[in-house]
UniProtKB/Swiss-Prot annotation:
GO cellular component, one term: tRNA-intron endonuclease complex
The protein's role, per its UniProt record: Constitutes one of the two catalytic subunit of the tRNA-splicing endonuclease complex, a complex responsible for identification and cleavage of the splice sites in pre-tRNA. It cleaves pre-tRNA at the 5'- and 3'-splice sites to release the intron. The products are an intron and two tRNA half-molecules bearing 2',3'-cyclic phosphate and 5'-OH termini. There are no conserved sequences at the splice sites, but the intron is invariably located at the same site in the gene, placing the splice sites an invariant distance from the constant structural features of the tRNA body.
Record's protein name: Probable tRNA-splicing endonuclease subunit sen34
Spans through the membrane: none
Length: 284
């Protein structure tokens, strides 16, 4: 289990996780929260309790791959491969499995209903004919509501070295190194990070699981030699203090690495990050 890798589906530029076990492992062991974006067709306007899939930011996805716990799956190509390799016998077998599952669920429901009837009749001292616990296998059922296992994960596990899977270099070609290093440095020290758009920053940092704690920091990353306007320093400090948080900025010093040529991505990813916190004294 410890060596198991979980697939991250790459769908139209988004990183999605469809496995509940993966969501649990990412959150518990790697402090990766993600954002649940799944909604029920019957309740398209719901915005409180969303479900799978879970969408990952580019930083979260790259962090999990760098830790060796995940790999990228090109979802479009995998589904095309599945359709091309699916035979009529596979379709028949799938329908047969769903119909068998429908029988089992219906019998279980009838059994539970009969048990309730027996309990009620015992209290009344009467007997009542019960519904038979069987169905004609030739009866037709609406199978659209019967759940089926997705095969995307199994295909991904079997074909992890296949050409149908995206190269990480292509997927993360435009990764912002400074932003990622800031993200990584905080997660590695035990923080949980969420998107910080609502507070006008890159990330919001929590000292523990976001379901149990309030966020402590508004996080922004900068290049080492990047000039930060004084107005930004004042605005960031005032905003952080106003919402009872601290504005945290930071960056990595890459001036002394590979001065004679272009810096490699591998060299940049090893750089340490320095952090600076800013508060607005006597305000808020």
């Amino acid at each position: 289990m410890e060596d198991e890798k979980f697939p991250i589906s790459y769908v139209h530029g988004k990183f999605l996780v469809f496995d509940v076990q993966a969501v649990e492992v990412f959150r518990k062991n790697y402090h990766i929260l993600g954002t649940l974006v799944g909604t029920l067709p019957q309740l398209p306007q719901q915005n409180v309790f969303l479900g799978l899939p879970m969408e990952l930011s580019k930083e979260e996805a790259f962090y999990l791959i760098e830790k060796g716990i995940s790999y990228i799956v090109d979802d479009t190509k995998v589904h095309k491969q599945l359709l091309e390799n699916t035979t009529k016998d596979d379709v028949k077998q799938c329908l047969k499995k769903r119909q068998s599952l429908a029988y089992d669920q219906m019998i279980a429901a009838k059994k539970k209903e009969n048990e309730k009837k027996i309990e009620i009749m015992k209290k009344l001292g009467r007997t009542l004919p019960l519904d038979p616990l069987n169905y004609d296998e030739h009866d037709s059922f609406d199978l659209s509501w019967i759940p089926v296992d997705t095969v995307t994960t199994r295909i991904a596990e079997k074909s992890s070295m296949n050409d149908d899977f995206h190269k990480e270099e292509d997927v993360f070609e435009n990764l912002d190194i400074n932003r990622y290093l800031m993200f990584k440095s905080l997660v590695d020290t035990g923080f949980y990070l969420n998107p910080g758009l609502r507070f006008g920053c890159q990330f919001v940092a929590y000292p523990g699981d976001a379901l149990r704690y309030h966020s402590h920091y508004l996080v922004n990353s900068y290049k080492w030699d990047q000039e930060i306007p004084v107005l930004f320093l004042i605005g960031g400090g005032r905003l952080g203090t106003a919402v009872k948080k601290t504005w945290l900025i930071g960056g990595s010093n890459d001036r002394n690495i590979n001065m004679n040529g272009e810096k490699s991505k591998e060299e940049l990813l090893l750089l340490p990050v320095r952090h600076f916190s800013i508060e607005w004294a006597g305000f808020g």
